[in-house]
Amino acid sequence: MKSNSKVNINNNGDNHNQTKNNGTNGFLPNSLKFISTCIRTASSGVRSASASVAASLSSDSHELKDQVLWSSFDRLHTSESSFKNVLLLGYTNGFQVLDIDDSNDVTEFVSRRDDPVTFLQMQPLPAKCDGVEGFRSSHPILLAVADEAKGSGPIVTSRDGSVRNGYEDPLALSPTVVRFYSLRSHNYVHVLRFRSTVYMVRCSPRIVAVGLGSQIYCFDALTLENKFSVLSYPVPQLGNQGISGVNVGYGPMAVGARWLAYASNSPLSSSIGRLSPQNVTPPGVSPSTSPNNGNLVARYAMESSKHLAAGLLNLGDKGYKTISKYCQDLKHDGPGPSLSSSPGRKVGRVGSHSAESDVVGTVIVKDFESRAIIAQFRAHTSPISALCFDPSGTLLVTASIHGNNINVFRIMPTPTKNGPGAQSYDWSSSHVPLYKLHRGMTSAVIQDICFSSYSQWIAIVSSKSTCHIYVLSPFGGENVLEIRNSQFDGPTLAPTLSLPWWSSPSFMTTHFSYPPPASVTLSVVSRIKCNNFFHAASSVVGKPTFPSGCLAAVFHQSVPQESQSSSPALDYLLVYTPSGHVVQYKLIPSLGGDQAESNTRNGATSGLTSEEELRVKVEPVQCWDVCRRADWPEREENICGLTYGGRKNAELTVDTSDSEDQTKPLEKHHVYLANAEVLINSGRKPIWQNSEISFYPMYPPDSDGKNLNSHQGGGETEIGKVSANEVDIRRKDLLPVYDNFHSVYTSMRNRGFSGERDSDSSSSSDPGQVKEMHPFNGMVYPEDEERRGSAHFALTPNQNPHTGIVTFKQPVVSISSAVKDTDYIDDDAHVLPKNASLPAETKIENSSGISGDSNVSSNRSDMSMNAADEGEGPIDGSPNFEQFFEEVVSNETVTETEHKDAPSDGKLDDDEDDDMLGGVFAFSEEG
């Protein structure tokens, strides 16, 4: 009766027979109901207002924009010594390549409408090989992972956040095709088809790695022949509803100059990299039988308490996992896949759980030239979702599916001799943990990772569209930022310059073996967050704002250098936002607290600041709306005919013998030495190696103000009116070469930091770039003509002032190649024009006319990894440590594990069972 009375009171609000207590109990629910109604009304009004404001942010509707599935920044290599920074966008109906190298000329290279594209990657210019042309004449080449079975249509994905509203039936993608698109001929010159989903692609001048669900195929970068394959840990399924094979984060695979890193599917070896447990007491001894049972009782009590604590923790962990799994099942009570349903996972058995716990989070680093495993270690206790090398190829970044902490390791191979002619590696000492980057307490998938040129800055982009910026030292240590006192600019923050812990100055007669620094946990110094509501509110009041959020990032300066800047920038960052804009940010030092107090505390010399003061502000400078619209025409720019600074540049085209559109090479300019410094190496860093020093080759202008191909000589010229191209200095001391770090001091005594390199020592596979700069005032440092590299090209658009659409002339380029006998199916008819479909019966196509001598069953293990034949690199920006590294080429034949996706054929040898035979390949993956 009491419950009925309450119902009547709540429903009617009138009952004179209620008691005092009942009246009180009825008043509270009514009050709470009234408050909840007010909150619901207010929130509904705010939601509708914010929706209307967000809808009015752009003049054109979101329906006019093509839906983005993939976004990333990459480098379009125009020669061995130069490249351009480009933005790659994959859509539900094709892809787009934009030149973002210069802020004054952001244009489209390619805009093609085709099948849905879920992954894009530019292939670097392959290393030259005598007598083998391969696909070098077709470069630059773009790799596009597409789904041929699905046409363009509505797709729901959180990879890039560009999701259309109003669609209820999402399209599930399963991309199984890797297409090689030539930016010279604007055709697909090669196609790889697989039976299972392709999740990621990584490229280097040596190999092209294609990552499937639980297997990785590695192809030769020059001939695109299958070299080997490895089994990997199953790729975590992290996609949203309706998506299969699209949103897996950055991807658990990384390719460096010589090494391949991937998630292992096998546990660590019991004899290497692990400690064996020891018994506390001898067998058969108990506290009651031992004469000195007092100490044993205490010891057993301590051990029992440890086991009890471990059991409680294990029980709590199992309970947490059970509740989490229950909530996860409730959350995924729909068409979307859950994390527990990842391929290859086994649950419900104790043995399988134990085996999986030993495997999960393990990383393998493999030398893809000698095919030896040089390092194997456990980086996380959860499945790995992201692996990335720095520009040097020796720093490895790892992240798990939770993304709370990102680990940074330095890979240092330690060769060991097991017998005559046999060589292996000590996995326990082949890696050094340097940093743990703390992102946050909540879980998020890592979507993008990028390093600066000197590996001092790193940007981590999460699935929440937030960019986390960290500063670190390439050689570890907790001192990552320091205050530098300048006579003109005053105190400012700057990254700390450090040297390797294994090196010793040349003036030291005694070698000291220093241990590596301890691992340090670093916090973010700045963030770029997604704040759409603030952006909408600012637009309402008429305050101009920049688009927020970040989906992809790269450290690059596309805007001209500010001559009158109150605070000099530490670095520049380009980001792609969820709204389809590219925003240029600059990193500005921010000193916390009172400046005078900071100077007093640190003294006259530069010192370290506290953690609260180690902050960096990000300031937006400029933005561009680059997302493709539905009414934009397709673009196919002629890469060979591009000019740069009014000059034809022959180095922009790949050095091939059959190219008919090569331009006349530049005539040599007069080179002047602006400044020289002769200094005996004493262990300190030379002035010219500081990050503030830049080098610029000059091109004298003619009477009309344009640059000439040759200098006529005579007269005077103002320095401020001369266009100059800044040479981007790259490190050369961080290359992944074999080195025994414990015995290098014998050669260091006589050579020091800078010495003459051997002819077969590795050079940088990431050469410097030459980027256009505006006229400036000040001293310039011209460089030698042979080391200057090629100037970047820039498109000259014809813009319609009425429509605002940029159009370009499209010269017709015809490429003919003789058809030869080869193991591939070689047919010029299979080169696809735009809007053409690929033949369904052809598994792998090739239209570049590969010589018959390059068959698919030949493994090029004799290809040297030395990059000396790639031309001379740019000026070093740091002390040269290459003479400390001694390359050891292993002749050991590594037998690859037999995989399930490679086709079987009786003609293949046992050590060639992972090669593809003929031109018709079908890769499959079971499980």
Curated annotation (Swiss-Prot):
Extent of Low complexity compositional bias: 335-344, 846-859
Topological type in the membrane: Peripheral membrane protein
One Pfam match: BCAS3_WD40
Renumbered residue ranges of the record's region Disordered: 1-25, 333-353, 750-788, 844-927
Induction record: By sucrose and nitrogen starvation.
UniProt keyword annotations, A-Z: Autophagy, Membrane, Protein transport, Repeat, Transport, Vacuole, WD repeat
Gene Ontology cellular component annotations, sorted alphabetically: phagophore assembly site membrane; vacuolar membrane
Protein name, as recorded: Autophagy-related protein 18h
Description of how the protein assembles with itself and partners: Component of the PI(3,5)P2 regulatory complex at least composed of ATG18, SAC/FIG4, FAB1 and VAC14.
Comment, domains: The first protein part may form a beta-propeller domain involved in specific binding to phosphatidylinositol 3,5-bisphosphate (PIP2), leading to the association of the protein to the membrane.
Function: The PI(3,5)P2 regulatory complex regulates both the synthesis and turnover of phosphatidylinositol 3,5-bisphosphate (PtdIns(3,5)P2). Required for autophagy.
Compositionally biased spans, kind Basic and acidic residues: 896-907
Expression tissues: Expressed in roots, flowers and leaves.
Keyword Repeat attached: yes
Record localization: Preautophagosomal structure membrane; Vacuole membrane
Similarity section: Belongs to the WD repeat PROPPIN family.
GO biological processes: autophagy; protein transport; response to starvation
InterPro entries: BCAS3-like (IPR045142), BCAS3_dom (IPR022175), BCAS3_WD40 (IPR048382), WD40/YVTN_repeat-like_dom_sf (IPR015943), WD40_repeat_dom_sf (IPR036322), WD40_rpt (IPR001680)
